[in-house]
Curated annotation (Swiss-Prot):
GO molecular function: ATP binding; galactokinase activity; metal ion binding
Organism: Mycobacterium tuberculosis (strain ATCC 25618 / H37Rv)
GO biological process, one term: galactose metabolic process
Keyword Transferase: yes
Protein name, per record: D-glycero-alpha-D-manno-heptose 7-phosphate kinase
Annotated family: Belongs to the GHMP kinase family.
Enzyme class: transferase
GO cellular component, one term: cytosol
Matching Gene3D superfamilies: 3.30.230.120
Residue numbers binding ATP: 111-117
Catalytic activity: D-glycero-alpha-D-manno-heptose 7-phosphate + ATP = D-glycero-alpha-D-manno-heptose 1,7-bisphosphate + ADP + H(+)
Function comment: Exhibits ATPase activity in vitro.
Keyword Kinase: yes
Residues engaged in binding Mg(2+): 117, 149
Length: 386
């Protein structure tokens, strides 16, 4: 019996945040510039026995199991897991339930502003689908994940996180009035990526936020046609396009200026976007060498994304940790979106001589194989003996 593993990357929202949320997105069209980073949501799935459903989330110290008929009893501790399971049954298994063991973990805390819950839904959805032999493409995967969170569960938010997790990499995404989302992958030069990675720091002050409160405030301002908030959201939408153009041509100083303008506009969309703790951290970072920064995600807490002079990275990090507490870390960008792979519980043994020959040839080519790992090509799969 195969064990399916999957992961979906978390993301940094660079520009356009909030324009992907209803009713703004359908009324005016949203624009999002985002990039995925080397932090992931993971899902590990295998078929259960009998009629048992078992969910585990070690990073949240949660575990639970129930019969298929008693699935609702798991909703309180595992609302996302239950909703994903129900969708997979309805969309890909003809309405027929099946026993399942599903474990998950995420590289960032809830409320981090990195799209962790949406990436988790994408990872669970793709992995559970793969377990029953289905493989939705990135557009279908993102749309279904969005529906699970926003429609099935009624969770507040936009669409950018699901599409970022499904596609991966640098993307400029736009929504149409009919709800269609178009993802435009960006080709960013390697030296531009290297400079951005050298300039980027993430600061986490230890305070997560409830994004639904911030989003509800923004939605209310759009519905009530709050002039300043609506103008600010239009500005954010326009800035996303400007930022994309600057990034493509490699204008990092211009990109940083655009990021700063976007943050200033975002704070006008809701009084909940920033708070004294965020402003204090922002000022400390600026005085130490930060060029521009913004809170990732809806706002109100989570990670502060900073563009700094690469020569002053250590100075900025030490100042923040000394004066504000929390932690500062670098991050790297990733190209790929959600992916699954399988780990056979048992495989047919291969002759030691063949395995040694393969390992020797690969070693001569500079490729190292670990004992027990699975090597796959387009034609065959071998298991290297332990």
């Amino acid at each position: 019996m195969a064990i399916l593993r999957g992961r979906a990357p978390l993301r940094l929202g660079l520009g356009g945040g909030g324009t992907d949320v209803e009713p703004y997105s359908s009324q005016f069209g949203g624009r999002i510039l985002s990039v995925t980073i080397d932090k992931y949501a993971y899902a590990f799935a295998e078929r259960g026995t009998g009629d048992e459903i078992a969910f585990r989330s070690p990073d949240r110290d949660r575990a639970g199991q129930a019969s298929i008929d008693d699935l609702a009893s798991l909703e309180e501790d595992f609302p996302l897991h239950v909703a994903v399971y129900r969708r997979v049954i309805a969309e890909f298994n003809g309405g027929t339930p099946f026993p399942l063991q599903l474990a998950t973990q995420v590289d960032a805390p809830p409320g981090s502003g990195l799209g962790s819950s949406s990436a988790l839904v994408v990872a669970m959805l793709l992995t559970t689908c793969a377990l029953i032999g289905s493989s939705p493409g990135p557009y279908e995967l993102a749309r279904l994940a969005w529906e699970i969170e926003r429609v099935d569960l009624g969770m507040a938010g936009g669409w950018q996180d699901h599409y970022a997790a499904a596609f991966g990499g640098f993307n400029f995404m736009e929504s149409r009035p009919n709800g269609e989302v178009v993802v435009n992958p960006l080709r960013i030069r390697r030296e531009v990526i290297a400079e951005l990675e050298a300039s980027l720091l993430l600061y986490f002050g230890g305070v997560s936020r409830l994004s639904s409160e911030v989003i509800a405030d923004q939605q209310r301002n759009v519905v009530e046609r709050d002039a300043d908030a609506l103008a600010a959201t239009h500005s954010i939408c326009a800035e996303a396009l400007e930022m994309k153009d600057l990034l493509v041509v490699g204008d990092i100083p211009g990109f940083a200026d655009s990021l700063l303008r976007g943050w200033q506009a975002k704070k006008r969309t809701s009084t909940r976007i920033s708070n004294p703790a965020i402003e204090h951290a922002y000022q400390v970072a600026q005085s130490s060498g930060m060029v521009a920064g913004k809170v990732s995600g809806a706002g109100g807490g989570g990670f502060l994304m900073m563009i700094v002079d690469p020569r002053r990275r250590i100075e900025v990090a030490r100042s923040l940790e000394r004066e504000c507490g929390g932690s500062v870390a670098p991050c790297l960008f990733t190209k790929g979106g959600a992916v699954t792979w399988h780990i056979p519980e048992s495989t047919a043994p291969v002759r030691r001589g063949v395995a040694d020959a393969v390992a020797s040839a690969l070693g001569n080519a500079g490729i190292l194989l670990c004992a027990g790992c699975v090597l796959a090509t387009s034609h065959s799969t071998w298991r290297v003996p332990v």
